[in-house]
Amino acid sequence: MAKSKFERNKPHVNIGTIGHVDHGKTSLTAAITKYFGEFKAYDQIDAAPEEKARGITISTAHVEYETPARHYAHVDCPGHADYVKNMITGAAEMDGAILVCSAADGPMPQTREHILLARQVGVPAIVVFLNKVDQVDDAELLELVELEVRELLSSYDFPGDDIPIIKGSALAALEDSDKKIGEDAIRELMAAVDAYIPTPERPIDQPFLMPIEDVFSISGRGTVVTGRVERGIVKVGEEVEIVGIRPTSKTTVTGVEMFRKLLDQGQAGDNIGALVRGVTRDGVERGQILCKPGSVKPHKKFMAEAYILTKEEGGRHTPFFTNYRPQFYFRTTDVTGIVSLPEGTEMVMPGDNVTVEVELIVPIAMEEKLRFAIREGGRTVGAGIVASIVE
C-alpha cells in the first residue's frame, strides 16, 4: 500500500492513555485504532520501541487515528517507569489524556500516581474510560467506582464532577462480543475526547520565543544571535527582550536570515539568525532567550517534578540528599542549582520520581511546564519539569 500524504486539514491533538498496570490501556489503544485508524493489534502496540529523550531511554508506542473532527497522535507506554519518564521528559507531549480504570478493581496506586503526574506536568484535560464493566454485575458497585474516580480526580485539582466518564469494555470492542459496551462505548469515548479535550494553541499563535544558541559579530552589521524559534513569529523591526542570566534588556530585530537568505520574519520551527540593534558581541550569551517583551520573566526558585535515572540507565549509583548541587540544563545551557528535598524525605534514590525545590545560582527565563535535564559534569542523571515558580 502506498503511503498516503498526511493531510493537514484537521486540527492535530496529542493524547495518551494513562492508568494502573493491567487496567486495559493497551487494549483500549488497540480498540480505538480498530474504529478510527489503521488497526494495530495489542502485541504490536505492547512491543513498543525504545527511544531517547533528553538522554533517557523510554519505551513508547505511537499510533495515529482520526475522528471526523480531528487528527490524533496517541502514545501508550508498556511499563509504569516508562510513563513516569515520558510525562516528565515530555518525550510525547500530551494535550490531554484518557485515564483507563478497571471497573472491577477501582482506582489503584498507579491510577493515583498518573493523575498526580498529569497535574504536575500540566496535562490540561482528562477523559475517563471505565473499562471491564462486563466483570461487574452490580450497578451500584459501578456507581461507587465512578464516584471514587471522580473524587480522586478532584483531589488533584481536576474538575472531577464535570469530567466525562465512559463505561465499556476494550476487550468486547476487540472481540466484537457486545456492541453496546464495545464499539458503541469506544465511539462515545472518542466523541467525548473530541468535545472535552481542548485544541491546543498552535506554536505559531503563541508569543515569540527563541532560545539563543550562538552569538556572532558581523563587521559593519552588528551582532547576530542564532537559534530555533520555539514559538510565535518575529518580524523585522519588532522590539524584543533578551531574558535570563543577566538583567533583562530590550533591543530591536533589524534583520532575520535563514539559509543565508534575508527574510522579513522568522516563525516557530525556523532556524534563524536575528540581527539585534545596539547589542555588543559580549552583551548577550547562549542560554538567554529572545522573546516578545513582557511575555517571559527570569526566575531562580521553583518547584520541580523530577525523575532520577537508575544506575543501569547511566545515572547515579548512590542516593542524594538535601543541598545536592547538580547542573540544570535549560534549553541551551547548564546552570548550577541547589536542591531542597520535601519535608520527611531523607534522600532520593536512583530510579525515584520526586517533587523538589530548586534554587538556581543565576535566573533563567522560565515558565511553568518548562523541561530540563539534570546533569553532573555533562552526564545526564535525571530529567524534570517546572511544576510551579516560587520566585
UniProtKB/Swiss-Prot annotation:
<feature type="region of interest" description="G1">
    <location>
        <begin position="19"/>
        <end position="26"/>
    </location>
</feature>
<keyword id="KW-0342">GTP-binding</keyword>
<feature type="binding site">
    <location>
        <begin position="19"/>
        <end position="26"/>
    </location>
    <ligand>
        <name>GTP</name>
    </ligand>
</feature>
<keyword id="KW-0251">Elongation factor</keyword>
<feature type="region of interest" description="G5">
    <location>
        <begin position="169"/>
        <end position="171"/>
    </location>
</feature>
<dbReference type="InterPro" id="IPR027417">
    <property type="entry name" value="P-loop_NTPase"/>
</dbReference>
<dbReference type="InterPro" id="IPR009000">
    <property type="entry name" value="Transl_B-barrel_sf"/>
</dbReference>
<feature type="domain" description="tr-type G">
    <location>
        <begin position="10"/>
        <end position="201"/>
    </location>
</feature>
<comment type="similarity">
    <text>Belongs to the TRAFAC class translation factor GTPase superfamily. Classic translation factor GTPase family. EF-Tu/EF-1A subfamily.</text>
</comment>
<feature type="binding site">
    <location>
        <position position="26"/>
    </location>
    <ligand>
        <name>Mg(2+)</name>
    </ligand>
</feature>
<dbReference type="InterPro" id="IPR041709">
    <property type="entry name" value="EF-Tu_GTP-bd"/>
</dbReference>
<dbReference type="GO" id="GO:0005525">
    <property type="term" value="F:GTP binding"/>
</dbReference>
<feature type="region of interest" description="G3">
    <location>
        <begin position="76"/>
        <end position="79"/>
    </location>
</feature>
<dbReference type="InterPro" id="IPR031157">
    <property type="entry name" value="G_TR_CS"/>
</dbReference>
<dbReference type="Pfam" id="PF00009">
    <property type="entry name" value="GTP_EFTU"/>
</dbReference>
<dbReference type="InterPro" id="IPR050055">
    <property type="entry name" value="EF-Tu_GTPase"/>
</dbReference>
<feature type="binding site">
    <location>
        <begin position="76"/>
        <end position="80"/>
    </location>
    <ligand>
        <name>GTP</name>
    </ligand>
</feature>
<dbReference type="InterPro" id="IPR000795">
    <property type="entry name" value="T_Tr_GTP-bd_dom"/>
</dbReference>
<keyword id="KW-0378">Hydrolase</keyword>
<feature type="region of interest" description="G2">
    <location>
        <begin position="55"/>
        <end position="59"/>
    </location>
</feature>
<dbReference type="GO" id="GO:0005829">
    <property type="term" value="C:cytosol"/>
</dbReference>
<dbReference type="Pfam" id="PF03144">
    <property type="entry name" value="GTP_EFTU_D2"/>
</dbReference>
<keyword id="KW-0547">Nucleotide-binding</keyword>
<dbReference type="InterPro" id="IPR033720">
    <property type="entry name" value="EFTU_2"/>
</dbReference>
<dbReference type="InterPro" id="IPR009001">
    <property type="entry name" value="Transl_elong_EF1A/Init_IF2_C"/>
</dbReference>
<keyword id="KW-0648">Protein biosynthesis</keyword>
<dbReference type="InterPro" id="IPR004161">
    <property type="entry name" value="EFTu-like_2"/>
</dbReference>
<comment type="function">
    <text>GTP hydrolase that promotes the GTP-dependent binding of aminoacyl-tRNA to the A-site of ribosomes during protein biosynthesis.</text>
</comment>
<comment type="subunit">
    <text>Monomer.</text>
</comment>
<dbReference type="Pfam" id="PF03143">
    <property type="entry name" value="GTP_EFTU_D3"/>
</dbReference>
<feature type="binding site">
    <location>
        <begin position="131"/>
        <end position="134"/>
    </location>
    <ligand>
        <name>GTP</name>
    </ligand>
</feature>
<dbReference type="InterPro" id="IPR004160">
    <property type="entry name" value="Transl_elong_EFTu/EF1A_C"/>
</dbReference>
<keyword id="KW-0460">Magnesium</keyword>
<feature type="region of interest" description="G4">
    <location>
        <begin position="131"/>
        <end position="134"/>
    </location>
</feature>
<dbReference type="InterPro" id="IPR005225">
    <property type="entry name" value="Small_GTP-bd"/>
</dbReference>
<keyword id="KW-0479">Metal-binding</keyword>
<dbReference type="GO" id="GO:0003746">
    <property type="term" value="F:translation elongation factor activity"/>
</dbReference>
<protein>
    <recommendedName>
        <fullName>Elongation factor Tu</fullName>
        <ecNumber>3.6.5.3</ecNumber>
    </recommendedName>
</protein>
<dbReference type="GO" id="GO:0003924">
    <property type="term" value="F:GTPase activity"/>
</dbReference>
<dbReference type="GO" id="GO:0097216">
    <property type="term" value="F:guanosine tetraphosphate binding"/>
</dbReference>
<dbReference type="InterPro" id="IPR004541">
    <property type="entry name" value="Transl_elong_EFTu/EF1A_bac/org"/>
</dbReference>
<keyword id="KW-0963">Cytoplasm</keyword>
